UniProtKB/Swiss-Prot annotation:
One of its GO terms (molecular function) is protein-disulfide reductase activity. One of its GO terms (biological process) is cell redox homeostasis. The record marks 91-92 as: Contributes to redox potential value. It comes from Bos taurus. Disulfide bonds join 90-93. Keywords: Acetylation, Disulfide bond, Electron transport, Mitochondrion, Redox-active center, Transit peptide, Transport. Belongs to the thioredoxin family. Residues 61-166 form the Thioredoxin domain. CDD domains: TRX_family (cd02947). Important for the control of mitochondrial reactive oxygen species homeostasis, apoptosis regulation and cell viability. Is involved in various redox reactions including the reduction of protein disulfide bonds, through the reversible oxidation of its active center dithiol to a disulfide. One of its GO terms (cellular component) is mitochondrion. The lineage of its organism: Eukaryota, Metazoa, Chordata, Craniata, Vertebrata. The keyword Ribonucleoprotein does not apply. This is Thioredoxin, mitochondrial. NCBIfam families: thioredoxin (TIGR01068).
Length: 166
């Protein structure tokens, strides 16, 4: 535990660019000047401690920001899209949303999910004739090919997606 805390403090000081004020700083400094510091299961070399890598995570679920964003990411999408019209105050939406995200994630990119908050985007809700929430549309090549209103269980959602994917 102490080794983890020591390592965390040292790495934090490297990232922030400030020297650590802790009493462990001299120990960490000496330990990491050696080619390799191995306290049990941890192995840190100075070059590893200073490298920070970032990767872009492609998500299968995204929030719609505005009308042009909807046009670009949903209507013009080559991938089939499930559009979840929801509201923050809607209890059933809070149940359906995570279920739908889980089922969409299982499809491994064959379908993506767009989330539209009807309070923020009433124009889209009116355009797609959303009269109750949650409303879920299945869109392919810019056209609505299927729709349902209300909560569904995971089996029904999987069948809904299989029909969309083809």
């Amino acid at each position: 535990m102490a080794q983890r805390l020591l390592l965390r403090r040292f790495l934090t000081s490297i990232i922030s660019g400030k020297p650590s004020q802790s009493r462990w700083a001299p120990v960490a400094s000496r330990a990491l000047q050696t080619p390799q510091y191995s306290p049990g299961y941890l192995t840190v070399t100075p070059s590893q401690a200073r490298s920070i890598y970032t990767t872009r995570v492609c998500s299968t679920t995204f929030n719609i920001q505005d009308g042009p964003d909807f046009q670009d990411r949903v209507v013009n999408s080559e991938t089939p899209v499930v559009v979840d019209f929801h509201a923050q105050w809607c209890g059933p939406c809070k149940i359906l949303g995570p279920r739908l995200e889980k089922v969409v994630a299982k499809q491994h990119g064959k379908v993506v999910m767009a989330k539209v908050d009807i309070d923020d985007h009433t124009d889209l809700a009116l355009e797609y004739e959303v009269s109750a929430v949650p409303t879920v549309l299945a869109m392919k090549n810019g056209d609505v090919v299927d729709k349902f209103v209300g909560i569904k269980d995971e089996d029904q959602l999987e069948a809904f997606l299989k029909k969309l994917i083809g």
